[in-house]
Amino acid sequence: GGGRPLMPGLIDMHVHPATFGPLQTLSRDMLHPYAHGALAVDRAHGMLLNGFTTVRDLGGPANYLRKIIDAGVVPGPRIYPTENWITTTSGHGDFRELNDPHPNIAGGRQHFYEDYVTIIADGRDEHLRAAREAFGRGRTNQTVVS
């Protein structure tokens, strides 16, 4: 190839470029944001070096990674971010611990869930609201896990 591309870039349709470790531990043991960012940048660069020029993120804080790649700050593939999953109470994406209050009930907290991984939504209206808010924040696709 003489240092030139041999084929068009690959597309990976299911990646988590900015999520590390078992998801059940992230709400309690998240990496420091600087370390987390450095690992995400390294992972994105590795994807690009492996020939993936476009990836579809299916959950995790990849929108921030996408922004710095798009701005030319770091090398990486084109990212189509999902960011938050939409899940139901006690569904596959509900990572609350036993004593954590429900985030949609008075006194509950959104903290980790709304910012990084999961939006808990029950019923049609809550799912529509969650999807509209996610797309309004720059998501390009949405993952629903029940």
Predicted regions and their residues:
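Short hydrophobic "helix-edge" motifs at membrane interfaces and signal-peptide entry regions
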Residues: 3-4, 128
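Metal-coordinating catalytic core of metallo-dependent amide/deamination hydrolases
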Residues: 73-146
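Active-site-proximal beta-strand/loop segments in catalytic clefts of secreted hydrolases
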Residues: 1, 50, 58-59, 82-83, ...
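Metal-associated gating/positioning segment near the N- to mid-region
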Residues: 4-71, 90-96
